[in-house]
Amino acid sequence: MKKTLMLLAMVVALVILPFFINHGGEYGGSDGEAERQIQAIAPQYKPWFQPLYEPASGEIESLLFTLQGSLGAAVIFYILGYCKGKQRRDDRA
C-alpha cells in the first residue's frame, strides 16, 4: 500500500511539475523544431519526399498521433501479458 501511494505521488508530480517549471512557455512539436534547425543549417535543403497524407488540421494530426501511440502500447502490453501468462502456466505445470 505504501509503495503504491509513493508511485502514485511520483506520477502526479511528473504530470503537474512541468506546468510550474515552464509556466507560460510555448508548446512546439519536434517536427517544427527540426524544420527550423534544418533551414538554419542548410537553407538550400529540399525534402526527399512528401507525406502520403496531410491531415486537415492540427487536431486531426494530434488524434492520429495519439491513436498510433495507443495502438503501439496495446500491442506491447498484450505481448508482455501473454508472455507473463505463459510463464505462469509453465510454472504451474
Swiss-Prot record:
Signal peptide: none annotated. The keyword GTP-binding does not apply. It comes from Salmonella newport (strain SL254). One of its GO terms (biological process) is cobalamin biosynthetic process. Forms an energy-coupling factor (ECF) transporter complex composed of an ATP-binding protein (A component, CbiO), a transmembrane protein (T component, CbiQ) and 2 possible substrate-capture proteins (S components, CbiM and CbiN) of unknown stoichimetry. The chain crosses the membrane at residues 5-25, 63-83. This is Cobalt transport protein CbiN. It is a multi-pass membrane protein. The lineage of its organism: Bacteria, Pseudomonadati, Pseudomonadota, Gammaproteobacteria, Enterobacterales. It is found in: Cell inner membrane. Pfam families: CbiN (PF02553). Part of the energy-coupling factor (ECF) transporter complex CbiMNOQ involved in cobalt import.
